[in-house]
Amino acid sequence: MGIMLFFAAIVLLSLFWRGIEMLTDWWWFQEVGYENVFWITFLTQMKVAALFGLAFFVIFYGNVFLANRLSSRGYWVDKDELIHTPPWELGNQSLSAIILLASVLFSLFVALRGSAHWEDYLQFFNATPFQISDPLFSRDIGFYVFQIPFLKTLYRWAMIILAISAVASGLLYFLRRSFQFIPPKELRVAPAARTHLSILIACLFFVGAGGAWLELNEILFAKRGVVFGPGYTEVTTQLWVLKVLIVVTGLCGLSFLVFIFRRDWRVPAAAFAAFLIVSVVGTGIYPALIQKLQVVPNEIVLEKPFLERNIKYTRIAYGLKDVEDREFPAEENLTQADLRRNDLTIKNIRLWDHAPLLTTYGQLQEIRTYYKFVDVDNDRYTVNGEFRQVMLSARELSYPAHPARTWVNEHLNYTHGYGAVLGPVNRITREGLPEFFIKDIPPVSTIDIKITRPEIYFGEISNDYTFVRTKRPEFNYPVGEKNVYSQYEGKGGVPLSFFRKVVYALRFGSLTILLSDDITPGSRVMYYRKISERVSRIAPFIRLDSDAYLVISPEGRLLWFLDGYTTTDRFPYSEPFRNMGNYMRNSVKAVVDAYDGTVELYLSDPTDPIIQTFAKIFPGTFKALEQMPAGLLRHIRYPPGFLSIQAKMLATYHMEDPQVFYNKEDLWSIPRKSGTGGEREMEPYYTIMKLPDEKKEEFVLLLPFTPSKKDNMSAWLAARCDAPHYGKVVVYRFPKQKLVYGPRQIDARIDQEAEISKQLSLWNQRGSQAIRGNLLAIPIEKSILYVQPLYLAAEKGQLPELKRVIVVFFPGHGRKPGACPPAGVWRRADPRKGSAESGWRSGSGAGSNGAADGRRSLGPLPQGPGIPKTGQLDRLRRRAEETGRHPEKPGKETLTTFTTEGTEMKNFGKIQKPNCQIGDTIFCLYFYRFILPASVFSVPSVVRKPL
């Protein structure tokens, strides 16, 4: 009895703490405006808990109580006679009390465990059809996604409850001596015990027959064959075996009911033997033999129709069916006109990688030890009227980095991060450091984008509770040796009262909350401040992307954008991807205000049946994407994580012919890149470019493909991010008969360039580390341009500087073997004429006064380290002037891509050098050093002609 009371105390204490958590969660849901989510979830959990708890109590207590009553009618004793005196000294009244208490405690435990299935319950009763039928049973896929999971849950719990009830009843009968074994093989069972236990065992088999029917449906998710889903063996062998198993299992149940009236063990024994044979041989050994002896030797012939199904349903499940397929000629004849038409693309080539830029941001702009830049995000803004790709990062508060970690500092004083930095992807200072459009504390902006509300109370690492509007002013930001303080003015946080202070002191396990005089009835408490946790609390059924990104709203507020996915592993025939299931949609865009924590959820894919189901379950929770303010709608982007998964599936499932698919004749892979951490797969990258046959530039997410176990490129994938084409994915295939260099091959060619290798070795020997940036393949018109930045960082310092940019391209056919591409010189911008560009001087007007193109002629170039000597410059100038006297010839143009914008930049000594010859195409590589007497440079286009 004492043990039972001990367990009862534990259960009550658990319920108390659970009640505290539920109460504070209710207050939080009220504050964020999603109280309906709380109540629907809570009431459903109570409903499901009651369903499972009552079911367990009724079945378990009813059977054990019945066993206790029936066992008192007769007992076997050693003299082989049935008597009516209980062998236990414990009275029936005490035993009944113990049974009742145990039943209640176990029922509470089952109820708590069962409440976890609330999502399955709601999906079962709110299922949305997919309007797609599986090819085997012709049922809508929604049946397998929404209804089978709850049926399986009911089956498992029914088996558990019946099994526990049967064991408990049998144990009670055994202790009451309702069984007697008479050597050598006779077992006597009291009539009441035999009847009761036979009914329980029969119920177990009847429920087991239902489980066999569920297993019949699970055949759609078989993993035996060459692909996921039922193959030849499952359809022709295992399918009918499972049907037989359903019948045999039901007959087993009937045999135990017959045993009640006919006291012959042979009937249930024979039925059970048949059950074991079908279960072991029919579902295991026999299909394995068919697979090994019949299918494997004739796999492609027998599995072909099932390969077709796997291809079809996998493409549907990952959205590959909607990927547009286009040809990309991969020509090698970029012209001046091509560059002019794609000037915006050239200006937005990203020169800063996330890792070195994050390190540099930390050194230059963290300001204090307790600030931290967690991540760098890519986005696009209209900057002073120009469409630009930028990189930005939030300056968050890092509690672990604070030198004085007291309770007051962590929960009252230091409550928020402050501001963000924003800069172009392609500009640096004269020291090789990133240029900032927005920087410092408080934020200083040099462009028409301003931050008016820089405080960050909710972020990627804000994972602890904090109190605002207290008597103690909050630290806002430092100014020199002094600090500026403030009070929170927003609507975020849960309002407090004395009662709530007591509850939160219990919730957070801190007596200081209750004793602090700084926390008043007008104070507010903020928790669930980490944005991913905040959104997950509101929509736990959404799988969130790990890469949230920051957006500056037109009003100057800082907002977090977070992509949400609906996934399932219940899509028939679809190939699973790691732990993501086998169906995936980017259905939700979450927007979280960094100041007041407001959460808005928008439907980015309203056609998805899974999100439609949850929209029915939680009405009013989601908004249409069209309801997002226009200023924010311009910043939604295709998530890189989703495109990576689609790309990895497309690498195999672009092959729709089952014969080609089976042989993996055209298998693709994601290119691998080299870096400081070794080789790893390339990740998708954003750029601003004009897609082939499109009229204007747009923000695009790119990822190249290579053939499996090869390094040349076979295709590239583009996901469009701007309206009205948001969400459209296009794969551009290269001609199979043409060799197009892949990133790894370009890396190898760069490694073989003597000038670069020499410079890298020199840097690495001087106490510095040369860091190779990510190599980007940028499609321009019908050609590919490769760009790789080089950074230099001191071994003991953490301030990477951009020192070189490597540009690789293929300059067209018709060049003589071994011919070197021509040299050229940079044009200097003329600030007196308001020129914002510098460029390569070539073509008509070169060497003149510039009247032909309205630009100044070349003047003397400054000397310095890495600058060609005067004689070399004279020869370069004469060759450039000679170029202007010859007409352009097709296939004779080459290009470089970097100039200055309002500043000077000079080429590095030996300007270019051909590395190899492939057929009649020269592989050209350019290695640049920047001489920056002014402040910054950027990346517009430059064209150079051969001499």
Q: Can you annotate each of these PLM segments?
A:
Residues 897-943, 947:
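Short, low-complexity, charge-dense intrinsically disordered segments
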Residues 8, 12-31, 35-870, 874-893:
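Soluble extracytoplasmic regions of secretory-pathway and membrane proteins
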Residues 1-6:
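N-terminal membrane topogenic signal
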